[in-house]
Amino acid sequence: MLTPMLARLRRRYPEAEIVMTVSRGQLPLYAPRPYGVVALAYDSRDPRSAKQLLELDPFDLALVPGDNRHAMLAHALGSRWVIALADARPGWKSRLADELVPVPAEPTALSDMFALLAGAQDDAVFEPDDWPRPESAPFELPQSDYVVLHVDAGSPLRFWQPHKWLKVADALASKGLEVVFCTGPGEEHMVEAIDPERRYQSYAGILDLPQLWQLLERARLLVCLDSGASHLAKLARTPSVVLYGPGSPVLFGPGRFWRGHPYRAVTIADFPCRDQKMVFKSEMNWVRRCQRTPRECPAPACMHAIDVEAVLASCGELLR
């Protein structure tokens, strides 16, 4: 999501040292130093990671993509100029920002929105050489042409029904493609529910992020939910069919920077309860998404409304 911002920063400041905080789990993706960026693991719940940052020299410029409460950290690090997006609520989050960039009044991908913190919109696109695939531990890849079905997401309200996943797998296999399932750690049970007879190979819960990148890089196609896998596929240049229920294809799709990415969004347009307009607690009138919890929404009707035929039609377009 932050790649367009990093790319624009590097173009504007070709000689600058660029440091970015990431979650510890994402750190291996930055081992090749994309755009010359130094990535540091940071967890706001871990005082040790804050101490690591406080030991650094002050920064000339700090960008705050996401929640503006992180402007306080940027200020504490001695940053000379802090830039964040405008209209964050509550207002105290933005008090330590020196510059607030207006949020777009027209539909804009979140990745392009974050890039505005680094300067005005331009026509740059992702160049694969700017982010080489990180080294990964060896594992056994499929031997023939294959497609990846990545079936988990950060919320159960984004899950698709198991029987529909199996129908997609069977249809793709009937075209002579090898089908492999994948999930993140701890979600292996999802594949067990989809394919209890284990007819298809599964990488559920066993791959780290560099390995997942390698798996995606060689795949003919990825079918996934609105999740981190869809964003990693952009780096791996994997043709992707992404299912959106509560989420917004406008916010989380390719946008301008990734416009060359082969991609199809499958969603039910104007679903009645996809009616919330908040992004990081800022209201944007053009946004249509749903951030309700499982307690508020016991069954994701927006996901259940997506049919197998629509997904397979998008798969067919990308497999031509």
Feature annotation, model-predicted:
Residues 1-320:
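Catalytic machinery of carbohydrate-active enzymes
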